[in-house]
Structures are given as structure tokens and as C-alpha cells.
Amino acid sequence: MTSPASPPLIHAVFFTLKDRSARARDALVAACRKYLTDHPGTVHFSTGTRAEPYERPVNDREFDVALVVVFATQADHDQYQQAPRHKQFIAEQSGNWAQVRVFDSWG
């Protein structure tokens, strides 16, 4: 008997920037696309700026850029965390991060 396949891992990251200008937000989105796409095991990738028109009471407005990467397995996610491009992204971009919130969940 085979064991059931592990569920995908959803890695959602919300960045609040020190420089919250449109230029800085766009630069982070571009860096996400440059360094964080096409990693082994990625089944979905998306990044973008906060949808400013949404001001409902339930909307969290304390972030500037969102990143969502879905990995086929937890092992794929764990390899991504150690990948040179991921580490380079952090090294180049973290100086402008006021806060980073990460939400990992099963898909």
C-alpha cells in the first residue's frame, strides 16, 4: 500500500517596506520575479502590490507587496529556502523591509 501524496505547501509572504513609494514597491515586485520564479517544484507563483482600492474592515492594509509561491511538496519548499537565488534576493532586498510576515499552509 502506498502512502497518500503530501499536499502542496503554500508559502505566502507579505512585505511592509521602509520606503513605501510606488517606485520601491515596483522594484520589490521586479526582484521577486527575477529571483523567486522557476524554482524546482513550483506549481504557482504570483507577486504584486496591495490592491489599494479595497478598504473593507476585513482588509489588512499593513503591507505593500505580496508574494505567493505554491510548492508541490514540503521538500521543494525547503530546497527553495536554501537556493542561491532566494538567498541573493534576501541579501539585495532586505534593507528596505520594515516587516515581513510569512504564512505557510497546506494546499
Which residues make up each language-model segment?
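C-terminal structural segments of small proteins and small subunits
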Residues: 74-95, 100
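Short S/T/G/P-rich N-terminal loop/turn motif that feeds into the first structured element of a domain
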Residues: 1-68, 72-79, 105-107
